[in-house]
Amino acid sequence: MSNNLINISVGSHETKEVMVSLIQRDINFFSYTDPEERLAAIKEIFAPGIVWFDFDGSTHHGHDGLLKRSSRLLNQLKGYSHRAKGGASVCQNMATARWEVVPEGSEEDHDQIPVIQGGDVLVVEDKKIKILWSYVDRYDEVLLHNLGQ
């Protein structure tokens, strides 16, 4: 398959429970700081041909592309943790959910102001995430001036 073309099956879709589980696990895979554990999580929830369209306009392909990109972001976000913000929304084989990045240790403190706020939109095929879009609504540009670069 060409990197310029993505095919999606439209005949069937997963249950809402499967979709919610996948988007929650998508957000949580950033909690794996060990690259081998993160790669195992990536392989469990993402299709081999995953395409990730990230907030800065970059595109990443396959399990190795997700591992490389997530490693770069985690290196930039040392001392911070991802957490889900609210619930997931599901429509057939598409799901969306919001997330935040907060200082490590403050994940349960919902008064903690996040340094990044964003969300993910994903498309699932055969119980694996096939396409992922990540967007950022707000981030601390002083603290994270080179985020994603």
Which role fits each region the language model picked out?
Residues 2-13, 18, 73-149:
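A beta-strand edge to alpha-helix "cap/lid" segment located at domain peripheries
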Residues 23-30, 46, 70, 97-101, ...:
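Hydrophobic alpha-helical core bundles mediating ligand binding, dimerization, or RNAP-core interactions
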